[in-house]
């Protein structure tokens, strides 16, 4: 390779015929590509995120079962200190949202305080009941969803 050709290939300004703006656009495009490669975006559909969270929750429940069998105590007074985020429950069967057995397994406080459709949690908190094929409790992202998105996923929101 000749020295002139090597310099031309190393300096992208000489390759751009349209002047400064074309080079800047090219540089911005290259920066964007490099950032995407360095920081891959997680663009999974919401349904697959729910499945990942379901799987993690099932594994957590399996680890907690031996602990629950050792100390079958009723919910304590400190369980009233729920976070201000949305509380959620799901059922593994096709039972009604207020079937007490599955809810009690997931969150004793909910089954203790929420006995019928008219009941509310302290502070007017919402409860989202999820109808999914497996016992699960998604947390961390549901509270960021808007009501239409939640309904699209088949979640029931109680006021």
Curated annotation (Swiss-Prot):
Region listing for Disordered, in residue ranges: 63-88
Domain IQ: 47-67
Cystine bridges: none
Organism domain of life: Eukaryota
UniProt xrefs under InterPro entries: IQ_domain_protein, IQCJ-SCHIP1_N
Annotated protein name in UniProt: IQ domain-containing protein J
Species name: Homo sapiens
Lineage: Eukaryota, Metazoa, Chordata, Craniata, Vertebrata
Biased composition (Low complexity): 76-87
């Amino acid at each position: 390779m000749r020295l002139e050709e090597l310099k031309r290939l190393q300096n992208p300004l000489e390759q751009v015929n349209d002047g400064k703006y074309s080079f800047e656009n090219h540089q911005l495009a290259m920066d964007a590509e490099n950032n995407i490669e360095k920081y891959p975006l997680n663009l999974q559909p919401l349904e697959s995120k729910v499945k990942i969270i379901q799987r993690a929750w099932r594994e957590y429940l399996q680890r907690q079962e031996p602990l629950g069998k050792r100390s079958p105590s009723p919910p304590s007074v400190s369980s009233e200190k729920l976070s201000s985020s949305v509380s959620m429950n799901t059922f593994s069967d096709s039972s009604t949202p207020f079937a007490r057995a599955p809810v009690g397994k997931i969150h004793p406080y909910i089954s203790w305080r929420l006995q019928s459709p008219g009941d509310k949690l302290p502070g007017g908190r919402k409860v989202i009941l999820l109808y999914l094929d497996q016992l699960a409790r998604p947390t961390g992202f549901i509270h960021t969803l808007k009501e239409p998105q939640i309904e699209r996923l088949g979640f029931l929101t109680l006021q």
